[in-house]
Amino acid sequence: MSDDLQGHRQEIDRIDDQILRLLNERSKSVIEIGKLKKQRDAEAHLHTPAREAAIFERLSKQNTGPFPTDAIRAVYREIMSASLSLEGPQKVAYLGPRATFTHMACMQKFGSSAQYLPSRRRLCVVAAILR
C-alpha cells in the first residue's frame, strides 16, 4: 500500500475519532436539555420539529461540499433520532405492516432509533401511541 494511501486513511481515522468524540459531547448536551425541559414542564414534548428544521436549514446553508447536502440531512436525521432516544423512547405508530410505504416514510422522518408500532386501523395508530 502506498504511503499516500496510508496517510489518507490515517487522516480519515483521526477525523472519525473526532466525529465520535463530538457526537458523545453533543449527546451530553442533549441529555441536559432533556432534563431542563422536564424540569420546566413534566409533559414537555421532547421532539421539537421547528428546532430540527432550523438545524437542517442552517447546516444546508453552511455546506460548501464536497459532502452532498442531501446526505447531511440523512446523517443528521440519524443523529437526531439517536439523540431523541437518549431523552426517552420515541414511539411512532403507522398504518399497515412493516416495510410498507407508511413504515418507510416514518423511518425517513424519525430515523432508525425510534420505536415503530405497526397498526391495522387508523384508530389503533392513536391507541398505540398512547400506550
Where is each model-derived feature located?
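Domain-level signature for soluble enzymes in the chorismate/prephenate branch of the shikimate pathway
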Residues: M1-R131
